[in-house]
């Protein structure tokens, strides 16, 4: 998103890394919004990871994401931010939803068990934006990207997503002359992937 905005000639961008601003800390988020003069917010921050991370740390996935969303949305509203874009996840839809998935399928069935806590947090983020819009007249929008890939991805073996995880496994197998590469699952499910810059352009357009 930053690359797209800069390519459009915008220079007044305010960013913070996780080390600079802990979004689960309401006091820090309140101080940030009271100090900076923000008119639009792209809420892309989240605790994310693959199947292993979601299975291992379900409490962190639901708590951290709900805290980040609640703090940013609430403090943005309190400081007068009228426009906000919340990036959710396609895992909010039921595991057995009819294909192609339609927006109205949200909360119409059971979620995928492996990432249910993360999905519940993202659903809460959507409802948070809808509730502030209804009560306070804000323009807080939600978009649900599918599996993203591209520059700046995370290749950590514990919490990477499927494409960087596979790239790392094949690279390490090649470098170590391994006789095989283990890939989880049956190989039958179909996955959808979206290039990160395409998602960024769509996010700026929706905002």
Regions found by a protein language model. Name each.
Residues 70-115, 141:
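Conserved Rossmann-fold NAD(P)-dependent oxidoreductase catalytic core, especially the SDR/UDP-sugar
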Residues 96-105, 130-207:
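NAD(P)-dependent short-chain dehydrogenase/reductase
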Residues 117, 121-124:
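Active-site helix of classical SDR
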Residues 26-66, 75-78:
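NAD(P)H-binding glycine-rich loop region in Rossmannoid oxidoreductase-like domains
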Residues 25, 40, 68-71, 83, ...:
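Conserved cofactor-binding/catalytic machinery of classical short-chain dehydrogenase/reductase
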Residues 6-32:
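Adenosine-cofactor binding site in Rossmann-like domains, unifying the SAM/SAH pocket
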Residues 68, 72-76, 128-129, 202, ...:
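Hydrophobic positions on the long internal alpha-helix
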Residues 16, 41-47, 84-90, 143-145:
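SDR active-site strand-loop-helix element
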């Amino acid at each position: 998103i930053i690359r797209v905005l800069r390519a459009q000639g915008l220079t007044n961008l305010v960013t913070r890394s996780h080390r600079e601003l802990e979004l689960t800390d309401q006091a820090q988020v309140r101080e940030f919004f009271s100090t900076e003069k923000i008119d639009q917010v792209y809420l892309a921050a989240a605790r994310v990871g693959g199947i292993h991370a979601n299975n291992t740390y379900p409490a962190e996935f639901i708590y951290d994401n709900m805290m980040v969303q609640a703090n940013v949305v609430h403090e943005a509203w309190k400081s007068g931010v009228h426009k906000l874009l919340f990036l959710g996840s396609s895992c909010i839809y039921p595991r057995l939803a009819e294909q192609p998935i339609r927006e109205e399928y949200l909360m119409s069935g059971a979620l995928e068990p492996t990432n249910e806590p993360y999905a519940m947090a993202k659903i809460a983020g959507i409802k948070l934006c809808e509730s502030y819009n209804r009560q306070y007249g804000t323009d807080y929008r939600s978009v649900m990207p599918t599996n993203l890939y591209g520059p700046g991805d995370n290749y950590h073996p514990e919490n990477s997503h499927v494409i960087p995880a596979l790239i790392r496994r094949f690279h390490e197998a090649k470098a170590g002359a391994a006789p095989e590469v283990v890939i989880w699952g049956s190989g039958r499910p179909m996955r959808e992937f979206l290039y990160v810059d395409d998602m960024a352009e769509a996010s700026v357009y929706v905002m």
